[in-house]
Amino acid sequence: MNRTHNRNDRRRFLKLAAGLAGIGLLRPTTTFAQHEAQITRVIASSGQRLPLIGMGTSRTFDVTPDPAAMANLGEVLQAFFQQGGTVIDSSPMYGNSEQVLGDLLRRIPPPANLFAATKVWTDGEESGIEQMEHSRQLWGVDGFELIQIHNLRDWQVHYETLMAMKSEGKIRYVGITTSHGRDHDELQSVLKSHPFDFVQFSYNIGNRDAERELLPLAADRG
Protein backbone atom coordinates (compact mmCIF):
# COMPACT_ATOMS: atom_id res chain seq x y z
CA MET A 1 0.00 0.00 0.00
CA ASN A 2 1.23 3.53 -0.78
CA ARG A 3 3.00 5.04 2.26
CA THR A 4 2.05 8.59 1.33
CA HIS A 5 -1.61 7.55 1.20
CA ASN A 6 -1.28 5.96 4.66
CA ARG A 7 0.30 9.09 6.09
CA ASN A 8 -2.47 11.25 4.65
CA ASP A 9 -5.15 8.96 6.08
CA ARG A 10 -3.48 9.03 9.48
CA ARG A 11 -3.16 12.81 9.36
CA ARG A 12 -6.88 13.19 8.55
CA PHE A 13 -7.80 10.81 11.38
CA LEU A 14 -5.70 12.72 13.92
CA LYS A 15 -7.24 16.02 12.83
CA LEU A 16 -10.73 14.55 13.23
CA ALA A 17 -9.89 13.14 16.66
CA ALA A 18 -8.51 16.50 17.75
CA GLY A 19 -11.65 18.22 16.50
CA LEU A 20 -13.91 15.83 18.39
CA ALA A 21 -11.92 16.35 21.55
CA GLY A 22 -12.19 20.09 21.06
CA ILE A 23 -16.00 20.00 21.06
CA GLY A 24 -16.12 17.67 24.04
CA LEU A 25 -17.11 14.46 22.26
CA LEU A 26 -13.88 12.75 23.30
CA ARG A 27 -12.80 13.34 26.88
CA PRO A 28 -10.15 10.75 27.59
CA THR A 29 -8.87 10.37 31.14
CA THR A 30 -5.62 8.87 29.81
CA THR A 31 -3.52 9.07 26.69
CA PHE A 32 -3.82 6.49 23.94
CA ALA A 33 -0.21 5.49 24.61
CA GLN A 34 -1.05 4.18 28.08
CA HIS A 35 -2.01 0.66 27.03
CA GLU A 36 -2.99 -0.59 30.46
CA ALA A 37 -5.20 2.39 31.31
CA GLN A 38 -8.83 2.67 30.28
CA ILE A 39 -10.18 5.69 28.45
CA THR A 40 -13.40 6.37 30.30
CA ARG A 41 -16.40 8.67 30.37
CA VAL A 42 -18.59 9.67 33.30
CA ILE A 43 -22.31 8.85 33.35
CA ALA A 44 -23.77 12.25 34.19
CA SER A 45 -26.67 10.95 36.29
CA SER A 46 -24.53 8.84 38.62
CA GLY A 47 -20.85 9.70 38.32
CA GLN A 48 -20.01 6.11 37.37
CA ARG A 49 -17.20 5.77 34.85
CA LEU A 50 -17.46 3.49 31.83
CA PRO A 51 -14.91 2.60 29.15
CA LEU A 52 -15.37 4.84 26.13
CA ILE A 53 -15.46 1.82 23.81
CA GLY A 54 -17.96 -1.01 24.22
CA MET A 55 -19.09 -4.08 22.30
CA GLY A 56 -22.09 -3.90 19.98
CA THR A 57 -23.85 -7.06 18.82
CA SER A 58 -26.07 -6.02 15.90
CA ARG A 59 -25.32 -8.18 12.84
CA THR A 60 -21.95 -9.40 14.14
CA PHE A 61 -23.52 -11.68 16.77
CA ASP A 62 -26.62 -12.44 14.70
CA VAL A 63 -25.23 -15.69 13.34
CA THR A 64 -26.16 -19.34 13.16
CA PRO A 65 -24.41 -20.74 16.26
CA ASP A 66 -22.28 -23.29 14.45
CA PRO A 67 -18.89 -24.25 15.95
CA ALA A 68 -16.83 -22.08 13.58
CA ALA A 69 -18.90 -18.94 14.14
CA MET A 70 -18.97 -19.45 17.90
CA ALA A 71 -15.22 -20.01 18.01
CA ASN A 72 -14.57 -16.78 16.08
CA LEU A 73 -16.91 -14.71 18.23
CA GLY A 74 -15.51 -16.34 21.35
CA GLU A 75 -12.04 -15.11 20.41
CA VAL A 76 -13.40 -11.61 19.90
CA LEU A 77 -15.22 -11.59 23.23
CA GLN A 78 -12.24 -13.02 25.11
CA ALA A 79 -9.92 -10.39 23.63
CA PHE A 80 -12.45 -7.69 24.54
CA PHE A 81 -12.48 -8.81 28.18
CA GLN A 82 -8.70 -9.21 28.30
CA GLN A 83 -8.28 -5.60 27.19
CA GLY A 84 -10.58 -4.38 29.95
CA GLY A 85 -13.84 -4.17 28.02
CA THR A 86 -16.98 -4.23 30.15
CA VAL A 87 -19.84 -2.64 28.17
CA ILE A 88 -21.90 -4.94 25.93
CA ASP A 89 -25.06 -3.75 24.18
CA SER A 90 -27.71 -5.84 22.45
CA SER A 91 -31.42 -5.92 21.60
CA PRO A 92 -34.22 -8.38 20.84
CA MET A 93 -34.26 -6.71 17.41
CA TYR A 94 -30.84 -8.19 16.63
CA GLY A 95 -31.99 -11.67 15.64
CA ASN A 96 -29.92 -14.40 17.31
CA SER A 97 -27.54 -11.94 18.94
CA GLU A 98 -28.76 -12.26 22.52
CA GLN A 99 -28.87 -16.04 22.39
CA VAL A 100 -25.39 -16.26 20.85
CA LEU A 101 -24.02 -13.74 23.33
CA GLY A 102 -25.53 -15.62 26.26
CA ASP A 103 -24.05 -18.91 25.08
CA LEU A 104 -20.63 -17.28 24.86
CA LEU A 105 -20.92 -15.64 28.28
CA ARG A 106 -21.54 -19.07 29.78
CA ARG A 107 -18.30 -20.32 28.21
CA ILE A 108 -16.20 -17.22 28.72
CA PRO A 109 -16.75 -15.78 32.21
CA PRO A 110 -17.28 -12.01 31.99
CA PRO A 111 -15.62 -9.56 34.38
CA ALA A 112 -17.35 -8.88 37.67
CA ASN A 113 -18.05 -5.33 36.50
CA LEU A 114 -19.78 -6.37 33.26
CA PHE A 115 -22.09 -3.55 32.12
CA ALA A 116 -24.94 -5.45 30.48
CA ALA A 117 -27.19 -3.30 28.30
CA THR A 118 -30.15 -4.29 26.16
CA LYS A 119 -33.32 -2.75 24.79
CA VAL A 120 -37.06 -3.25 24.82
CA TRP A 121 -38.59 -3.47 21.35
CA THR A 122 -42.25 -4.41 21.38
CA ASP A 123 -45.71 -2.97 22.04
CA GLY A 124 -47.58 -3.09 25.33
CA GLU A 125 -46.64 -3.20 28.99
CA GLU A 126 -46.86 -6.96 29.55
CA SER A 127 -45.10 -7.77 26.29
CA GLY A 128 -42.32 -5.40 27.27
CA ILE A 129 -41.89 -6.96 30.70
CA GLU A 130 -41.88 -10.46 29.21
CA GLN A 131 -39.39 -9.47 26.53
CA MET A 132 -36.97 -7.95 29.01
CA GLU A 133 -37.11 -11.03 31.22
CA HIS A 134 -36.53 -13.24 28.18
CA SER A 135 -33.48 -11.16 27.30
CA ARG A 136 -32.14 -11.59 30.83
CA GLN A 137 -32.54 -15.35 30.57
CA LEU A 138 -30.85 -15.45 27.17
CA TRP A 139 -27.89 -13.49 28.49
CA GLY A 140 -27.74 -15.58 31.65
CA VAL A 141 -27.20 -12.54 33.87
CA ASP A 142 -28.78 -11.57 37.17
CA GLY A 143 -29.95 -8.27 35.73
CA PHE A 144 -29.16 -5.41 33.38
CA GLU A 145 -27.40 -2.18 34.21
CA LEU A 146 -29.13 -0.38 31.32
CA ILE A 147 -32.30 -0.99 29.34
CA GLN A 148 -33.20 1.40 26.53
CA ILE A 149 -36.43 1.88 24.59
CA HIS A 150 -35.49 0.81 21.08
CA ASN A 151 -36.37 3.17 18.22
CA LEU A 152 -38.96 5.00 20.36
CA ARG A 153 -41.31 2.02 20.09
CA ASP A 154 -44.28 2.45 22.46
CA TRP A 155 -41.98 4.63 24.51
CA GLN A 156 -44.61 6.13 26.82
CA VAL A 157 -45.62 2.69 28.10
CA HIS A 158 -42.11 1.31 28.43
CA TYR A 159 -40.85 4.49 30.09
CA GLU A 160 -43.20 3.99 33.03
CA THR A 161 -42.17 0.33 33.33
CA LEU A 162 -38.46 1.12 33.21
CA MET A 163 -38.66 3.96 35.70
CA ALA A 164 -40.49 1.64 38.10
CA MET A 165 -37.80 -1.02 37.59
CA LYS A 166 -35.14 1.58 38.29
CA SER A 167 -36.80 2.74 41.50
CA GLU A 168 -37.03 -0.90 42.62
CA GLY A 169 -33.33 -1.45 41.95
CA LYS A 170 -33.90 -3.94 39.12
CA ILE A 171 -31.93 -1.80 36.65
CA ARG A 172 -29.57 1.11 37.16
CA TYR A 173 -30.19 3.23 34.07
CA VAL A 174 -32.96 4.03 31.59
CA GLY A 175 -32.32 5.08 28.00
CA ILE A 176 -33.99 5.68 24.66
CA THR A 177 -32.75 5.22 21.10
CA THR A 178 -33.45 5.81 17.45
CA SER A 179 -31.40 4.72 14.47
CA HIS A 180 -33.46 6.80 12.05
CA GLY A 181 -32.72 10.44 11.28
CA ARG A 182 -36.37 10.97 10.42
CA ASP A 183 -37.23 10.41 14.10
CA HIS A 184 -34.81 12.96 15.52
CA ASP A 185 -37.54 15.58 15.98
CA GLU A 186 -39.65 13.19 18.04
CA LEU A 187 -36.60 12.17 20.06
CA GLN A 188 -35.87 15.81 20.84
CA SER A 189 -39.41 16.29 22.08
CA VAL A 190 -39.14 13.22 24.32
CA LEU A 191 -35.81 14.33 25.78
CA LYS A 192 -37.19 17.77 26.59
CA SER A 193 -40.10 16.33 28.56
CA HIS A 194 -38.66 13.21 30.24
CA PRO A 195 -35.38 12.52 32.05
CA PHE A 196 -33.15 9.73 30.73
CA ASP A 197 -29.74 8.46 31.77
CA PHE A 198 -28.72 7.42 28.24
CA VAL A 199 -29.67 8.39 24.70
CA GLN A 200 -28.52 6.76 21.47
CA PHE A 201 -29.08 8.11 17.96
CA SER A 202 -27.62 8.12 14.47
CA TYR A 203 -24.50 10.28 14.15
CA ASN A 204 -21.55 9.65 11.86
CA ILE A 205 -19.26 11.28 9.33
CA GLY A 206 -21.89 10.91 6.63
CA ASN A 207 -24.78 12.14 8.77
CA ARG A 208 -23.93 15.01 11.11
CA ASP A 209 -27.44 16.45 11.50
CA ALA A 210 -27.39 15.68 15.23
CA GLU A 211 -24.76 18.39 15.75
CA ARG A 212 -27.37 21.11 15.24
CA GLU A 213 -29.82 20.24 18.01
CA LEU A 214 -29.64 16.72 19.42
CA LEU A 215 -26.08 16.81 20.74
CA PRO A 216 -26.48 20.21 22.44
CA LEU A 217 -29.82 19.09 23.90
CA ALA A 218 -28.36 15.84 25.21
CA ALA A 219 -25.46 17.74 26.78
CA ASP A 220 -27.85 20.22 28.37
CA ARG A 221 -30.02 17.43 29.78
CA GLY A 222 -27.00 15.69 31.26
What is the predicted role of each segment?
Residues P67-A79, E125-L138, R182-S189:
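Short, acidic/polar
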